Amino acid sequence: MEFVVDKSRKTVVITAEFAAERDLVWKAYTEPELLDQWWAPKPFSSRTKAMDFREGGRRFYAMVSPEGQESWAVQKYTSITPKTNFKFLNAFADENENPQLPGSDWDLNFSEQNGKTTITTTIYNESRERMEMLMSMGFKEGTEAAYDSLKELLATLSQARGQSNG
């Protein structure tokens, strides 16, 4: 995983490669029952309360600590090009889905070559302070841990897919 922080542009760019076909990786990002299996870094878990994956739709979810403490967030989908790109505004929220602005704009690009999928995620922060707060909360380490869980999930799904095709 490559993780680049550009403070002058208030951006974080994350590039990662996964040993899975793009349609499977896309599903892991766009289907709540799969997304909840990897989005939160262990030992936290992700719990989606509502998700409508379409332009103008949203995902409302909580990161849940091992002690049961919930940290809520909302993602509002602004653009979707199936299996290649989607964008959303991400903001922390309270349990009633009231966003705590400023948020950040996420732009995710999916490409496949030789059965491997590369995801490039560009996160544009509305303020440098928000970006620095995310980094101080362990965003890089959390992303690495979540991607480790995603790799495990994709391996399991790829194996199951191979068995069902055989």
Q: What are these language model-derived features?
A:
Residues 1-45:
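Hydrophobic ligand-binding cavity/cleft-lining segments
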Residues 22-23, 52-54, 78-85, 109-118:
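A short, structured loop/turn motif at beta-sheet edges
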Residues 6-8, 53, 67-71, 98-102, ...:
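A generic structural micro-feature
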Residues 13, 46, 70-75, 101-106:
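Short, surface-exposed coil-to-beta transition loops
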Residues 47-91:
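Glycine-rich portal/gate segments that line the openings of hydrophobic small-molecule binding cavities
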